[in-house]
Regions:
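Conserved "landmark" site that anchors the functional core of diverse proteins
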Residues: 1-135
Length: 135
């Protein structure tokens, strides 16, 4: 599951699940994230999941890297644990003033506009994260 656990500065550790970005690895990251969060482990003050990593930040006045690493290494995650996924429908406007690359796609794919939109709208997309990044 976790390929490597290393320190990230003085008060955080870095759980590395590998370099690939896919739903399987991401679900392992999220399951570990949720398990640690639910356990409410003393000293852990922040959890930051990404596509294939989890950062566990902790309070050095309460705990240390060695203790948190041992806890993380020994956490049991149920493979059958269900993730709290939601299916969202996001409205999309495909007016020609917004679909600036449609002509290029028509030529490249040898499809007309309607065929391209049909392919696009008949596909489900997996969203790894939502939110905003500062900057």
């Amino acid at each position: 599951m976790i390929k490597n656990i290393s320190n990230l500065g003085d008060a955080a550790l870095y759980c590395d699940f590998g370099t690939e970005v896919n739903k399987d690895i991401n679900s392992k990251v999220i399951k570990l994230f949720e398990t640690i969060r639910e356990k409410n482990i003393e000293g852990i003050n922040n959890l930051t999941p990404s596509y294939n990593k989890l950062i566990v930040s902790f309070d050095l006045k309460i705990t240390n890297f060695k203790k948190i690493k041992e806890i993380v290494e020994n956490i049991q995650i149920k493979e059958t644990q269900k993730l709290n996924n939601k299916k969202l429908e996001i409205p999309v406007c495909c007016d020609s003033s917004f679909s600036l690359d449609i002509e290029r796609l028509e030529k490249k794919l040898n499809l007309d506009r309607e065929q391209i939109l049909e392919v696009f709208f008949n596909k489900e997309f997996f969203c790894y994260m939502t939110g905003f990044i500062a900057g």
